[in-house]
């Protein structure tokens, strides 16, 4: 019997279907189930309601369940991702080669992504957990990114990695324009690095996997 192959896809084939379904739940499902839940609850609590139909109670409690359960499930998953990311980031901070200043790091709960900038050491760290149950842990210095592109929603870091030429940083992690300007100012200034921080992060992939309990993608 063949062992089950562990996926390395950041976004598996089912993700598009789940993404569309989630959008439909937020924009259509929540208003509909909220209307049904409140309407039937008011009906059951009304003095004018003399019925005792099982269907009315099924619809009422079913509406409340479908309104609340998906949100609770998604929030629980997001919190789990956040804790895994925090553990990895904290371990890297303890190395002494990455210590971001206050206001120069952020974590997006909804997208499971972290980004921080260490002005003193000239290093940056990107950590993200993808729907395919795989994690990116990528260290940057002023030598392994080529340019940045910004808009209101994200910062795009164009890298020198062949298999990951661009890294998207959500705006919840860092203000795109501010982070971009800071990175280019750091590159113009120049740094003397005691260690190759990006390589150090890659060489410790197995350690990050043990901490997070999931595979960490290799970048090259």
UniProtKB/Swiss-Prot annotation:
Cross-referenced InterPro entries, in alphabetical order?
Exclusion-determining_protein
What are the alphabetically sorted keywords of the record?
Plasmid
Q: Anything else the record notes? A: Conjugative plasmids generally prevent the effective entry of donor DNA from other cells carrying identical (or closely related) plasmids by encoding a barrier in the cell envelope. In R144 this type of exclusion affects only DNA transfer.
| Protein name per Swiss-Prot or TrEMBL | Exclusion-determining protein
Write the lineage as a comma-separated list. Answer: Bacteria, Pseudomonadati, Pseudomonadota, Gammaproteobacteria, Enterobacterales
């Amino acid at each position: 019997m063949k062992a089950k192959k562990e996926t390395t896809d950041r976004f598996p084939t089912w993700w598009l279907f789940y993404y569309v379904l989630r959008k439909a739940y937020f924009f259509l499902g929540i208003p509909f189930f909220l209307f049904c839940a409140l309407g039937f609850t008011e009906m059951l609590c009304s003095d004018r309601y003399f019925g005792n139909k099982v269907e009315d109670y099924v619809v009422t409690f079913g509406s409340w369940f479908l309104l609340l359960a998906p949100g609770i499930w998604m929030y629980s998953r997001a919190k789990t991702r956040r804790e895994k990311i925090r553990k990895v980031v904290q371990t890297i901070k303890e190395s002494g080669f990455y210590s971001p200043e206050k206001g120069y790091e952020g974590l997006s709960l909804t997208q499971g992504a972290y980004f921080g900038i260490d002005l003193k050491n000239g290093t940056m760290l990107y950590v993200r957990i993808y729907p395919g149950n795989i994690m990116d842990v990528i260290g940057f210095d002023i030598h392994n990114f080529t340019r940045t592109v910004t808009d209101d929603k994200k910062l795009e870091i164009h890298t020198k990695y062949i298999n990951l030429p661009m890294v998207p940083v959500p705006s919840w992690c860092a203000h795109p324009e501010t982070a971009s300007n800071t990175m280019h100012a750091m590159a113009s200034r120049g740094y003397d690095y005691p260690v190759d921080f990006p390589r150090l992060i890659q060489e410790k992939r197995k350690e990050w996997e043990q901490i997070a309990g999931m595979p960490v993608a290799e970048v090259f």
